[in-house]
């Protein structure tokens, strides 16, 4: 299989010229914002005098997560007794898999394992089942699946890299080429079709039609349920009422964000509660999911405490009070990227990068003068610790911490794989700082970029390439010349596309706050300026670009032979985590109630757990 070509901007800029289709794919990023800020942590810009230089301030509030609080986190879910119980449950689930022979039951079990967040324990078994099903499809072995099972099998196979044809859904169309109207009566089948449609690639019109059809059906169902809510509560028996309420809950969740775009850990935390209330839930699966969640959470707490000690030792939070201190939020990004406990090193070191990128972003975006920013950019290009002497005082410490962190990462890769990657890590940082500098020049000159000019810079200035270049070296062994050429020539398409989604999601969630701060125009403003569109129209266009970029990432599944499956999945997880972080506003900078609830649910509070007797 040929490796994918690297075109520095072509895959992204082609989005700007593609023909417009409906972007109504649910309720992504709800509720919609107005131009009024939703954040309680950002205030109008104020200027303070520092060394006779007028500097902007975003007035970010200090972190609410103190060092002492983080260090006090404890979990009972560690040690041999819990590990032994988990292994016992794992054996029971394995027996359940082996004993499930009926095709639909196998698919449902795989889907449940994934949504409960425990499928990573059974990857080999799942791959064996799906490979067998794909071979059956290739051999035209027909199981006469209904809409639900056809869509479920399609989604699971595409998710695992099997390029099943979209034509399987033509069986559910009428003689005019439209999906049969009676399908709307099978609401769970329609939901399954909806989830499958988000694995579409460019020009897959059947899946595009499936998305539009299923979205309309699901919204109509939700409207009907809302109108008939009182009637349903009184006229249905307990079992039917439960099923209806369960369907409403699942459908509403899907319309907010499709399953393909959600991070595993957050979905697991939500679905465990939903699954527990199902009448046909399996108590073994439920106990396994709860125990595994809590045990993994205990490893996350240890990683977080390690990160907190590094942060305190760096003293950056004390010295740079103009910048965001968002250690906890940075770690939450890492939980989205790779939650499994065996990847503690990656979470710990990558979270440092998130923290440092946030600080450097605030230096360029808010605090530094243009002359100072040019000095910092040159220092990063030189990558010489002596360059610190040419920097203003407040820049010296962040430069030194960045320099030491990157060198430490390079040292680790050299020791593990005998490969010196410092030039590649440095290149990603230089690209980042140059983009930051260009955006600062736009700000100081009052320049209004076009959307095309903005995107050329913005997918890099979001900082994602720095994280993903590091991820490549963490999840690639051995490192090959074939794959390294992509980083020599530019960046692989999968990185560009992932980072574009991160940027667009960021813009969508932070637009109102950044508008109040007077920051550089973002994608929404650029589109409004280019076309004369309203804010609502611009938001719809950004949602459309996100959807189209996902189609490009879906297509890359057939072109990623140069990269490990783990690395490709981390790239996609970065995009998913951005959609999670910015779904309801600025989940990175704003310490609002929803952000705190998510952190408590995923990192701090265990799930109520009782071992079966």
From Swiss-Prot:
Transmembrane segments: 455-475
Key words, A-Z: Chloroplast, Lyase, Magnesium, Membrane, Metal-binding, Plastid, Transit peptide, Transmembrane, Transmembrane helix
Principal location: plastid
Motif (DDXXD motif): 361-365
Transit peptide as recorded in UniProt: 1-46
Localization annotation: Plastid, Chloroplast membrane
EC number: 4.2.3.15
Key word Coiled coil present: no
Positions annotated to bind Mg(2+) 3: 506, 510, 514
Membrane topology per record: Single-pass membrane protein
Binding residues annotated for Mg(2+) 1, in chain numbering: 361, 365
Pfam families the UniProt entry points to: Terpene_synth, Terpene_synth_C
UniProt binding sites for (2E)-geranyl diphosphate: 324, 361, 365, 503, 506
Catalytic activity: (2E)-geranyl diphosphate = beta-myrcene + diphosphate
Binding sites annotated in the UniProt record for Mg(2+) 2: 361, 365
Protein name (record): Myrcene synthase, chloroplastic
Biological source species: Humulus lupulus (European hop)
């Amino acid at each position: 299989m040929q490796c994918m070509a690297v075109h520095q901007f072509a895959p992204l800029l082609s989005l700007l010229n593609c023909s417009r289709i409906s972007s109504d794919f649910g309720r992504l990023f709800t509720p919609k914002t107005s131009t009024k800020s939703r954040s309680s942590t950002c205030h109008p810009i104020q200027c303070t005098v520092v060394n006779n230089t007028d500097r902007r301030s975003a007035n970010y509030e200090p972190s609410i997560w103190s060092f002492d609080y983080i260090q006090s986190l404890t979990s009972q879910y560690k040690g041999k007794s819990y590990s032994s119980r988990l292994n016992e449950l794992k054996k029971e689930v394995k027996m359940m898999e082996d004993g499930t022979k009926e095709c639909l039951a196998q698919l449902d079990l795989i889907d449940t394992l994934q949504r409960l967040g425990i499928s990573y324990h059974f990857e080999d078994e799942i791959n064996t089942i799906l490979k067998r099903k794909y071979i059956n499809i290739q051999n035209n072995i027909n199981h006469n699946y209904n809409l639900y099972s056809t869509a479920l099998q399609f989604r699971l196979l595409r998710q695992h890299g099997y390029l099943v044809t979209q034509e399987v859904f033509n069986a559910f169309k009428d003689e005019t080429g439209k999906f049969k109207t009676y399908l709307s009566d099978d609401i769970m089948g329609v939901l399954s079709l909806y989830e499958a449609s988000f694995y579409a690639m460019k020009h897959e019109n059947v899946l595009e039609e499936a998305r539009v059809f299923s979205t309309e059906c699901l919204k109509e169902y939700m409207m009907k349920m809302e109108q008939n809510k009182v009637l349903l509560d009184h006229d249905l028996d307990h079992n039917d009422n439960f099923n209806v309420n369960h369907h409403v809950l699942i459908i509403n969740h899907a319309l907010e964000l499709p399953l393909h775009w959600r991070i595993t850990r957050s979905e697991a935390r939500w679905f465990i509660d939903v699954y527990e209330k199902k009448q046909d839930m399996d108590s073994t699966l439920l106990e396994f999911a709860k125990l595994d969640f809590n045990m993994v959470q205990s490893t996350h707490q240890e990683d977080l405490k390690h990160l907190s000690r590094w942060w305190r030792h760096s003293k950056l939070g004390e010295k740079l009070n103009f910048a965001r201190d968002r250690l906890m939020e940075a770690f939450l990004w890492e939980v989205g990227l790779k939650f499994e406990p065996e990847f503690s090193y990656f979470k710990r070191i990558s979270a440092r990068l998130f923290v440092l990128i946030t600080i450097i972003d605030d230096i360029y975006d808010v605090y530094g003068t243009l002359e100072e920013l040019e000095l910092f950019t040159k220092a990063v290009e030189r990558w010489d610790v002596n360059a610190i002497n040419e920097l203003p005082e407040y820049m010296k410490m962040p430069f030194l911490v960045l320099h030491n962190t990157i060198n430490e990462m390079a040292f680790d890769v050299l020791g593990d794989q005998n490969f010196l990657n410092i030039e590649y890590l440095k290149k990603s940082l230089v690209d980042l700082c140059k983009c930051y500098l260009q955006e600062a020049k736009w700000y100081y000159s009052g320049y209004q970029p076009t959307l095309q000019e903005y995107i050329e810079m913005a997918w890099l200035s979001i900082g994602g390439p720095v994280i993903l270049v590091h991820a490549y070296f963490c999840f690639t062994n051995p490192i090959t010349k074939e794959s390294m050429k992509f980083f020599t020539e530019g960046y692989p398409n999968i990185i560009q596309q992932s980072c574009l989604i991160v940027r667009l999601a960021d813009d969508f969630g932070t637009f109102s706050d950044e508008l109040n701060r007077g920051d550089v125009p973002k994608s929404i403003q650029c589109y409004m300026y280019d076309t004369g569109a309203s804010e609502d129209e611009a938001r719809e266009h950004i949602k459309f670009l996100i959807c189209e970029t996902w189609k490009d990432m879906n297509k890359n599944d057939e072109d990623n032979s140069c990269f490990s499956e783990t690395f490709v999945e981390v790239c996609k997880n970065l995009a998913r985590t951005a959609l999670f972080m910015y779904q309801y506003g600025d989940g990175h900078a704003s310490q609002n109630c929803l952000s705190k609830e998510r952190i408590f649910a995923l990192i701090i509070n265990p799930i109520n757990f009782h071992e079966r007797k």
